[in-house]
């Protein structure tokens, strides 16, 4: 699972998922990308499930770029515990994803393989996604 090696503070406040993404909104490394259309917290387990699905679809060959990283800790109180008495323990880590963010990119495979792999990966995520292609405009940047 992806998680930060060290953190200055163990727990964070939740924050808000407002507005569009600031950066990371174009295909930078691969030929095809999977873009988020909704705001969400994507857990480390969901990122790993999408990655494994793509790797299995490619069998051999192809390169996968994961453009999001779960660096935000989320906490949960134990079952049957009354409210109060402090914030719960860290349960896992999430990546904060806003609309327009490129989450995964693939390279080194045919268009059909890339489209199918990204479609399968999109089904592993709790948000609506779309597949984008690197075009001439992106290469000029």
Swiss-Prot record:
This protein's UniProt keywords: Ribonucleoprotein, Ribosomal protein, RNA-binding, rRNA-binding, tRNA-binding
Molecular function terms, GO-annotated: rRNA binding; structural constituent of ribosome; tRNA binding
Gene Ontology process terms (BP): translation
GO CC annotations, alphabetized: cytosolic large ribosomal subunit
Stored Gene3D superfamilies: Ribosomal protein L10e/L16 (3.90.1170.10)
Pfam family, one: Ribosomal_L16
InterPro entries per record: Ribosomal_uL16 (IPR047873), Ribosomal_uL16_bact-type (IPR000114), Ribosomal_uL16_dom (IPR016180), Ribosomal_uL16_sf (IPR036920)
Domain of life: Bacteria
Subunit description: Part of the 50S ribosomal subunit.
Family designation: Belongs to the universal ribosomal protein uL16 family.
Functional summary from the UniProt entry: This protein binds directly to 23S rRNA. Interacts with the A site tRNA.
Entry protein name: Large ribosomal subunit protein uL16
